[in-house]
């Protein structure tokens, strides 16, 4: 029988797709199954690709959208910071859930992800966090029902297992119906599919030049234990992430060469 008792007293939800994004609605439905009290503090507009960035040189504007629901003119990191340190300062959340992102956040791409950035900002200020993303094969037919069906049990299992305070969890749901998902795998980050950044240029109706940034993706060899491989095999991929980014091989080589 599926567990129905509240897991948390208070949970904070955020994302990088914006407060009106369908993935946030999915996450709210998930959170109401897990918590007695759900707070939503999310960007007023799409903030995809903003990573861990914080708005240090301009003020944040916070707009109340309902009971315990706020839109912030800022990044996902801003949302987490102002929620925990201001809006919820008298009763901090037990956990921050970030997502559900439209599309997977895998490998190198997690460095740029605002969804993951929000979770890592939460970790920085001492609140456990999970980033959740729903992979798709057709952007116009994202299988949100997969995350909706599986996320409550996945979160319960992760909380029961526990994880270190200097890590947040990155969860990716595969692009298939929930009944066809093969299970859950704990994975490493791996390389993912991000190859670089492309520039798409043009001219607007006023004949002013513009430039769009586009992430370039392509299949690449990856570690057998990576999240990208697990997702491709039909598993929910769970990867613990941390801030520490030292390249150990380069460190050893430079120390040998330079002392």
UniProtKB/Swiss-Prot annotation:
Main location group: cytoplasm
Needed co-factor(s): a divalent metal cation
Note accompanying the cofactor annotation: Binds 1 divalent metal cation per subunit.
Residues at which a divalent metal cation binds: 16-17, 48, 101
GO terms of molecular function: 3'-nucleotidase activity; 5'-nucleotidase activity; exopolyphosphatase activity; metal ion binding; nucleotide binding
Family to which the UniProt record says this protein belongs: Belongs to the SurE nucleotidase family.
Biological role stated in the UniProt entry: Nucleotidase that shows phosphatase activity on nucleoside 5'-monophosphates.
Gene3D superfamilies in alphabetical order: Survival protein SurE-like phosphatase/nucleotidase
Organism: Burkholderia lata (strain ATCC 17760 / DSM 23089 / LMG 22485 / NCIMB 9086 / R18194 / 383)
Protein's name according to its UniProt entry: 5'-nucleotidase SurE 1
Entry keyword annotation includes Disulfide bond: no
One Pfam family this sequence matches: SurE
UniProt GO cellular component terms: cytoplasm
Catalytic activity: a ribonucleoside 5'-phosphate + H2O = a ribonucleoside + phosphate
EC number of the protein: 3.1.3.5
Gene that encodes it: surE1
UniProt keyword annotations, A-Z: Cytoplasm, Hydrolase, Metal-binding, Nucleotide-binding
Subcellular location: Cytoplasm
């Amino acid at each position: 029988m599926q567990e129905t008792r509240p897991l948390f007293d208070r949970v904070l939800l955020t994302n990088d797709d914006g407060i009106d994004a369908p993935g946030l609605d999915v996450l709210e439905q998930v959170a109401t199954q897990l918590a007695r009290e759900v707070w939503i503090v999310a960007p007023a507009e799409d903030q995809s690709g903003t990573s861990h960035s914080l708005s240090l040189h301009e003020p944040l504007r916070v707009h109340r959208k309902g009971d315990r629901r706020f839109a912030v003119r800022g990044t996902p990191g801003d949302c987490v910071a102002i929620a925990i340190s201001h809006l919820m300062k008298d009763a901090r959340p037990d956990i921050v859930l970030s997502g559900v992102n439209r599309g997977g956040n895998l490998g190198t791409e997690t460095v740029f992800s605002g969804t993951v950035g929000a979770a890592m900002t939460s970790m920085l200020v001492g609140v456990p966090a999970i980033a959740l993303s729903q992979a798709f094969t057709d952007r116009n037919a994202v299988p949100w029902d997969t995350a909706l069906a599986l996320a409550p049990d996945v979160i319960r299992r992760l909380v029961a297992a526990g994880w270190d305070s200097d890590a947040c969890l990155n969860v990716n749901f595969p692009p298939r119906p929930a009944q066809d998902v093969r299970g859950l795998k704990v994975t490493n980050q791996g390389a993912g599919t991000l190859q670089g950044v492309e520039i798409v240029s043009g001219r607007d109706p006023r004949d002013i030049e513009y430039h769009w940034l586009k992430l370039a993706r392509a299949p690449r060899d990856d570690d057998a234990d990576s999240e990208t491989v697990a997702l491709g095999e039909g598993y929910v991929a769970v990867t613990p992430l941390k801030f520490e980014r030292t390249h150990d091989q380069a460190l050893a080589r430079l120390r040998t060469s330079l002392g």
